[in-house]
């Protein structure tokens, strides 16, 4: 009887031990599943964070590139403005000199045919001054507009009079009353005052 009782107790202990092992295994499995779930969640979070980081880095790189481009554009604009200022800084001074050159030209045209020694000396001195002024203008890239027999260009010519003539094409410069001037072949300092041809039969 005692043996049976012991056997029963032993069986109960075994069963309890088995149950405990099963519970422990179940708990371990649950822990393992929980850990796997946590690992999955962590991996997803890491993936999301990596994507966000990559996007942020791309955004920063794009902003840096944009800023670099803007700096380059600004630098180009500044250099361009400085170059323009340098090129055209003397514009007002040159414009002030033009009437002096005009007056010398007019004076020379009035006395050019005089043969007396007094006039010849004046003509020589005025020619010398005139050539010096032309050299200075040339050094500063000032070009004269005084060509005849070319098409009238309203950008550089100012029509002062019309010459009706069937032998010359319409809208051609017949004569230049006052020379015009350009700075760096880009900026008009003063238009040339010209006489323009027009056919009588038109």
UniProtKB/Swiss-Prot annotation:
Source domain of life: Bacteria
Family named by the database record: Belongs to the GrpE family.
Name under which the protein is recorded: Protein GrpE 1
GO molecular function ontology, one term from the record: protein homodimerization activity
GO cellular component, one term: cytoplasm
HAMAP family named in the record: GrpE
Signal peptide: none
Pfam families: GrpE
Compartment(s) of residence: Cytoplasm
Gene: grpE1
GO biological-process terms attached to the record: protein folding
Function: Participates actively in the response to hyperosmotic and heat shock by preventing the aggregation of stress-denatured proteins, in association with DnaK and GrpE. It is the nucleotide exchange factor for DnaK and may function as a thermosensor. Unfolded proteins bind initially to DnaJ; upon interaction with the DnaJ-bound protein, DnaK hydrolyzes its bound ATP, resulting in the formation of a stable complex. GrpE releases ADP from DnaK; ATP binding to DnaK triggers the release of the substrate protein, thus completing the reaction cycle.
SUBUNIT field: Homodimer.
Origin species: Buchnera aphidicola subsp. Schizaphis graminum (strain Sg)
Keywords: Chaperone, Cytoplasm, Stress response
Main subcellular localisation: cytoplasm
